[in-house]
Amino acid sequence: MNAIRWLGELLEETHWSFVVAVVVIYGINQGFGYALAKVGTDYYMKDVQKLQPSESQVYLQIARIPWVIKPIWGLFTDIVPFFGYHRRPYFILAGIVGILSMLFLSLHEKLHIGLALLSLMAGNAGGAIADVTVDACIAHQSVTHRSLAPHMQSLCSMSSSIGALIGYSLSGVFLHLIGPKGVYGLLSIPYALMLLVGILLDEQRALTDYTQVPKKFWDAIMRMLTTLIRQDVWGQCFYMFISFALSLNIHEGLFKWETDSKAGPSFSQGTKN
């Protein structure tokens, strides 16, 4: 009952479309969708594209570039509105890009790795754009409803955790039933819900002078650079970069062994009886 009362308070104080947006983006797309995509992409690279672990690792890191440049998407959502809206058009754009990229991967036979990589990058771009957009919505709601800010973060974490738990629990089942390409087709559903969020989201339309957009964009970049050159900021960023860059990641090699028909336990679509 406390959980229901807590959720009801969020719905009453903010807006139901905001809560739906958080659940869709954090729970269904990033939680469930990421878990399903992670397992499906591993098998897609090995069983469909027939790539070696070293090749797969490189391609997957390239495909994640849209997530690396998330600050750029954030600048666009804050500074460049469409038809007076800063959030709704970006949810719609992210949904359309994600749907098309997932269906392209799902429906094409013998897709060239270059086209597959572009499709994966497009899908990640859709996810990254939606992520920064919903974060902007949360930041706005946290300012207007300061007492509910911790509860909003709890909603984000809870949605993501539950979605990921369900996604990883069912990913093997879906992979067995419909294969890696079928999984990509299934992943178009979270992006369709993302598109629906863009249509339904409650957002006030604002008057915008588009002639000021370049100046605002440049000012935002300069403020960002001013922040980054502070020692207490760039030092922490440099430490995090080095810690990630020097950390060995043997996931693709381990996955190759796990799915090998001779040396490993053969957990593979390509070798199942």
Where are these regions (language model features)?
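Hydrophobic core of transmembrane alpha-helices in multi-pass small-molecule transporters
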Residues: 28, 101-130
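Cytoplasmic helix-loop-helix junction between adjacent transmembrane helices
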Residues: 122-158
